[in-house]
């Protein structure tokens, strides 16, 4: 089994879509093995997205991710990273495939409901940013 990290972003929480998005995730065969509701500070959001520090959208991303509560989750499934990225759709909801999370719920490229790790290696690092080992449910 492979794991990936997702974050239901502040726009998802504000629009009261947590349940709808988790339902879509579980219906796609993912198992939630860790989940919490938290609020990132500008500092922690900046640390999490440090890889984008030199990109023009970095400041807006940090501001947005620290603007309200978010829900990080570790998901488990065979081929989790690729399958999850397919489920959520393109970063820009206008370019996302029909039926994807972002096509259904996102308003813009900047406020796009959900983060998904882009590789198994990054998923492991990102999961460790939010969760201690004892917070993760063991696989059966």
UniProtKB/Swiss-Prot annotation:
Which cofactor is essential here? Mg(2+)
InterPro entries cross-referenced by the UniProt entry:
NDK-like_dom, NDK-like_dom_sf, Nucleoside_diP_kinase
**Matches recorded under PROSITE patterns:** NDPK_LIKE (PS51374)
Leading EC class = transferase
Keyword Chaperone on entry = no
According to its UniProt record, what is one Pfam family this protein matches? NDK
Job description of the protein: Major role in the synthesis of nucleoside triphosphates other than ATP. The ATP gamma phosphate is transferred to the NDP beta phosphate via a ping-pong mechanism, using a phosphorylated active-site intermediate.
This chain belongs to which protein, by name? Nucleoside diphosphate kinase
Q: Tell me what organism the protein belongs to.
A: Chlorobium luteolum (strain DSM 273 / BCRC 81028 / 2530) (Pelodictyon luteolum)
Q: Which gene encodes it?
A: ndk
């Amino acid at each position: 089994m492979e794991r990936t990290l997702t974050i239901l972003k502040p726009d998802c929480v504000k629009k009261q879509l947590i349940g709808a998005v988790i339902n879509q995730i579980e219906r796609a065969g993912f198992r939630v093995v860790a989940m919490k509701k938290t609020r990132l500070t500008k500092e922690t959001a900046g640390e999490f997205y440090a890889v984008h520090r030199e990109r023009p959208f970095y400041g807006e991303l940090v501001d947005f991710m620290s603007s309200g509560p978010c829900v990080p989750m570790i998901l488990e499934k065979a081929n989790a990273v690729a399958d999850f990225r397919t489920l959520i759709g393109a970063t820009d909801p206008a370019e996302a495939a029909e039926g994807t999370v972002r096509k259904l719920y996102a308003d813009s490229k900047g406020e796009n409901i959900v983060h998904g790790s882009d590789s198994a290696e990054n998923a492991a690092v990102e999961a460790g940013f939010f969760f201690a080992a004892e917070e993760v449910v063991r696989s059966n």
